[in-house]
């Protein structure tokens, strides 16, 4: 009796899946024929069994393989460009090349900090230049002009009482700026005399 139940069940399952299995066999044959016809085509080399559920009232939308391949290639190129950009940015950010691996977020944060520091440095330089071009030199500034242009250490470095509120970096910047401005004005004067 068990053999009869198993045989009946098997017969019912076979009749239910028969149209579906015939559809799969047909697709396999078509895929093999297409592979033989154009084996060099990349989309046909990746020929996968595509199931159609027409009998169930549902069809799976099929995308164009070449369009998908082009879209994937564009995305790979975009990601590659982004990664190369971050690699270049890491090389220009302080301590970026020294660190073993900075994440993209860390790289961007470091770049923002670096840009802010450079902007602050420019602002300070502009402020110092404006004070020096004002034409009202303080005694320490006039002493600074008496030092030779060959020395980056001007009289500012010995007169620390006039800018105690500045940090050591700001003091060095002020010393260098004073020396550079004197050197630059001396070079422009020599150029005018030479012409």
Curated annotation (Swiss-Prot):
<feature type="region of interest" description="Disordered">
    <location>
        <begin position="141"/>
        <end position="164"/>
    </location>
</feature>
<protein>
    <recommendedName>
        <fullName>Achaete-scute homolog 1b</fullName>
    </recommendedName>
</protein>
<keyword id="KW-0221">Differentiation</keyword>
<dbReference type="Pfam" id="PF00010">
    <property type="entry name" value="HLH"/>
</dbReference>
<keyword id="KW-0217">Developmental protein</keyword>
<dbReference type="InterPro" id="IPR015660">
    <property type="entry name" value="MASH1/Ascl1a-like"/>
</dbReference>
<keyword id="KW-0524">Neurogenesis</keyword>
<keyword id="KW-0805">Transcription regulation</keyword>
<dbReference type="GO" id="GO:0003700">
    <property type="term" value="F:DNA-binding transcription factor activity"/>
</dbReference>
<keyword id="KW-0238">DNA-binding</keyword>
<dbReference type="GO" id="GO:0005634">
    <property type="term" value="C:nucleus"/>
</dbReference>
<dbReference type="GO" id="GO:0046983">
    <property type="term" value="F:protein dimerization activity"/>
</dbReference>
<keyword id="KW-0804">Transcription</keyword>
<dbReference type="GO" id="GO:0031018">
    <property type="term" value="P:endocrine pancreas development"/>
</dbReference>
<dbReference type="InterPro" id="IPR036638">
    <property type="entry name" value="HLH_DNA-bd_sf"/>
</dbReference>
<comment type="function">
    <text>Transcriptional regulator. May mediate transcription activation by binding to the E box-containing promoter. Involved in neurogenesis. Involved in maintaining rhombomere boundaries in the hindbrain, probably via up-regulation of delta expression. May mediate transcription activation by binding to the E box-containing promoter.</text>
</comment>
<dbReference type="GO" id="GO:0043009">
    <property type="term" value="P:chordate embryonic development"/>
</dbReference>
<feature type="domain" description="bHLH">
    <location>
        <begin position="66"/>
        <end position="118"/>
    </location>
</feature>
<dbReference type="InterPro" id="IPR011598">
    <property type="entry name" value="bHLH_dom"/>
</dbReference>
<keyword id="KW-0539">Nucleus</keyword>
<dbReference type="GO" id="GO:0030182">
    <property type="term" value="P:neuron differentiation"/>
</dbReference>
<dbReference type="GO" id="GO:0090575">
    <property type="term" value="C:RNA polymerase II transcription regulator complex"/>
</dbReference>
<dbReference type="GO" id="GO:0000977">
    <property type="term" value="F:RNA polymerase II transcription regulatory region sequence-specific DNA binding"/>
</dbReference>
<dbReference type="GO" id="GO:0007420">
    <property type="term" value="P:brain development"/>
</dbReference>
<dbReference type="GO" id="GO:0007423">
    <property type="term" value="P:sensory organ development"/>
</dbReference>
<dbReference type="GO" id="GO:0000981">
    <property type="term" value="F:DNA-binding transcription factor activity, RNA polymerase II-specific"/>
</dbReference>
<dbReference type="GO" id="GO:0045944">
    <property type="term" value="P:positive regulation of transcription by RNA polymerase II"/>
</dbReference>
<dbReference type="GO" id="GO:0050767">
    <property type="term" value="P:regulation of neurogenesis"/>
</dbReference>
<dbReference type="GO" id="GO:0045666">
    <property type="term" value="P:positive regulation of neuron differentiation"/>
</dbReference>
<dbReference type="GO" id="GO:0021575">
    <property type="term" value="P:hindbrain morphogenesis"/>
</dbReference>
<comment type="subunit">
    <text>Efficient DNA binding requires dimerization with another bHLH protein.</text>
</comment>
């Amino acid at each position: 009796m068990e053999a009869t139940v198993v045989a009946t069940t098997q017969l019912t399952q076979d009749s239910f899946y028969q149209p579906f299995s015939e559809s799969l066999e047909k697709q396999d044959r078509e895929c093999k024929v297409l592979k033989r016809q154009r084996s060099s085509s990349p989309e046909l080399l990746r020929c996968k069994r595509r199931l159609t559920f027409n009998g169930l009232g549902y069809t799976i939308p099929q995308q164009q393989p070449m369009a998908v391949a082009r879209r994937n290639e564009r995305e790979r190129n975009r990601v590659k460009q982004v990664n190369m950009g971050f690699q270049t940015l890491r090389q220009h950010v302080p301590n970026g090349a020294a660190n073993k691996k900075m994440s993209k977020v860390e790289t961007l944060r470091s770049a923002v900090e670096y840009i802010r520091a450079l902007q602050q440095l420019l602002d300070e330089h502009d402020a110092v230049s404006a004070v020096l071009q004002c034409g009202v030199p303080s005694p320490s500034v006039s002493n600074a002009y008496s030092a030779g242009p060959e020395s980056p250490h001007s009289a500012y470095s010995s007169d620390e009482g006039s800018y105690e509120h500045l940090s050591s970096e700001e003091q060095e910047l002020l010393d260098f700026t004073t020396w550079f401005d004197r050197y630059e004005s001396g070079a422009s004067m020599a150029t005018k005399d030479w012409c």
